[in-house]
Curated annotation (Swiss-Prot):
Protein's name according to its UniProt entry: Cation/acetate symporter ActP
Record topology, Cytoplasmic segments: 56-75, 126-145, 206-211, 287-297, 382-401, 451-461, 517-549
Disulfide bonding pattern of the chain: none
Membrane topology summary: Multi-pass membrane protein
GO BP, one annotated term: plasma membrane acetate transport
GO cellular component, one term: plasma membrane
Amino acid sequence: MKRVLTALAATLPFAANAADAISGAVERQPTNWQAIIMFLIFVVFTLGITYWASKRVRSRNDYYTAGGNITGFQNGLAIAGDYMSAASFLGISALVFTSGYDGLIYSLGFLVGWPIILFLIAERLRNLGRYTFADVASYRLKQGPIRILSACGSLVVVALYLIAQMVGAGKLIELLFGLNYHIAVVLVGVLMMMYVLFGGMLATTWVQIIKAVLLLFGASFMAFMVMKHVGFSFNNLFSEAMAVHPKGVDIMKPGGLVKDPISALSLGLGLMFGTAGLPHILMHFFTVSDAREARKSVFYATGFMGYFYILTFIIGFGAIMLVGANPEYKDAAGHLIGGNNMAAVHLANAVGGNLFLGFISAVAFATILAVVAGLTLAGASAVSHDLYANVFKKGATEREELRVSKITVLILGVIAIILGVLFENQNIAFMVGLAFAIAASCNFPIILLSMYWSKLTTRGAMLGGWLGLITAVVLMILGPTIWVQILGHEKAIFPYEYPALFSISVAFLGIWLFSATDNSAEGARERELFRAQFIRSQTGFGVEQGRAH
């Protein structure tokens, strides 16, 4: 049981233990011209792709789903590119650098939600939906209320994730490039808007694919050079790391991340079910032609991400040997220059020199751009498709819907820049944890039960979904992270850092209770419609494929 709890505790988002690069003050580094030049090459190339994509975006289908013409392999790379953030790359490597073996369990925790997506969600989501997961949730339920709830859940998750990414972008670029924080935030915001505004999902997908390839190449090269240093022997790798690490043999012992069983379960559930409720990830399943390609997308994405997180483990131990024991990378006080999250960046310099250091720094920036572009498109589609076209102005033309979507992109971009500047010196690490908790407590229960439970009604979905969302937010505010560390109170009202265990339970219980007690004629009609939905979800009958889907 203790091993299980250890593993579950390790599945929390990077924000809890690996967020020093995205929270508080950072030590600005000298201007890195190699990194800036390489990043400019990446920007010019991706803007060229955006121009190419803009010539092919002629309809709503093209803008939201790239015309449904992305292959399973391409989509798998894009999903991996959307999910593998710069903070997970630097943060997990830093956790292995400081804690050893626990970092491996931690990195594997990022994958626990993907079997759920593969076996329970991907195919049915593609067969039932068109542009957003709200299409699936509202398939047999009342369009208006369900779309409002789904859009609110999406927008809250997107907003929290976007703030964390923008602040993280500013901090990381200040660390890696030596650029001013405000310049970095504005640069990320402007590029993000350009990708999404002109290229839509097609440009966003290819930016994410390129970023994934660059990140996988860079991490593979670093891991190869580390293993070459130890004669391609894991025994030598671990022995040398234990010999130079201050904790010695203790870095090979698990369990250092466990606080208590409730926190472990709550964190584990939050990441596992939260992944299956992230709107910018779910949107990718509508970019492929059919359910078979959607399933292949998850298969490839899981493979790429699993490989990547194994590499971060090798990189972390390599940093212990080649960076931790090298005084060149320490300041006068004996601490790592720039903080522990710079371990992977310093290792890039140690194994590949200044040129490769510039490459890894540019890849870290590209990683942020790929993630924020996906978030922005998900937020814009929630407003334009779910709210505008299906609630506030039913029957809106494609042109009107696309105009609203692009206006939303501009508004989201400006808001993201402003909030990124305002939160510069705030501890925003909790925001990613809260985003996962809300995705797990509001989005995931509604998606899952709308596809699998025949007795679900609009009444149950609405009351249970809102209860889950509100519970997650309230418990997070009353918990130690916000109530004590940010608001300055002496003791937290809610004793646990992450609320997912409780808010998910409230959501599922609420959905079951209010659906089971719904005796209305509308509820009976919605239950009867489940059979037709089930047939389509299993067979794909009635789903248009390719460009016209």
